[in-house]
Amino acid sequence: MNSRKPRGSGRTPAVGKRGGPFQERDFQRQIGARKGAGRKGGPRHRDEPAPDFYDEDGRTRRTRRGKGAGAARAREKNLGRIHHEDGERLQKVMAAAGVASRRVCEDLISEGRVEVDGVVVTEPGVRVDPKTSVIRVDGVSVQTDVAKQYLVFNKPRGVISTMVDPDGRPSIATYLKSGQEHLFHVGRLDNETEGLLVLTNDGELANRLLHPSYEVPKTYLVQVKGPLPKGVSNQLKAGVELEDGPAKVDSFKLVDSTPGHVLVEVVLHSGKNRIVRRMFDAVGHPVERLVRVKIGPILLGDQKQGSVRVMNAQELGHLKAMVGL
């Protein structure tokens, strides 16, 4: 594995004069404003109340519980179908999957917020098979297969989106621990583009994230020279013609500006090669700096350049739900 990292990786550029290019702190201010959801699902104290799982709009989502003795009898009747005598206790499996501490998982179960194979479970004594049982908390799936890995990488500029580069240039593997080289990146960022890459060994999830039919949105911060004419926004939203067909952004928002430069946020679901750079070239405003800050519900937040973190249980659950898993 090549251990050489790109020069300047992770450093904060020197502050320039106002009116010059945006500095690292300007990008971090914009990225940091979007970091809230990336913190959900982190470690919790054992005495904290059971957490809510969240929709992307921030509203809590709870599983509806059946009412009355009839519903209770129906649930108990189904327990025999989902109970595995030789399996592991449900709260232990949930805790191992990173949902919460075992005690908090017991609270989630007793509140009727956990389903196993479509059956609401309220008794922590139920045993399940981690390999075959489908577990959901507040409707969000829980990943119980410990062999599968899901990582979030903040790619620095100058890093090649590949595991091994025959020319010896810095690659993704430069930043991974021993034994993680078997993971593959979902999509790619060109050499000069920074930001969020998902790394996994889950082939089905990767295929769905890349398939255009699922239209997974990607969010970018784009720096270009200013001033930017008002018509550029409408052009990009209406669509521009590229050599491989038309392309358009789903949304366009001006987030900051100086006398000489403009910082915008664009959202699009296309995964074509260098699509953002080519679209801005087409409207006469070449990209100076490009950072991907979000894929679906996964946020870059304040994650440091060159760092790799494990995707938390809630992020993974929402990401899978977005692509029908």
Placement of each model-derived feature along the sequence:
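Acidic low-complexity intrinsically disordered regions
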Residues: 1-92, 96, 103
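Basic, flexible Lys/Arg- and Gly-enriched helix-loop patches that mediate nucleic-acid binding at interfaces
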Residues: 16, 69-325
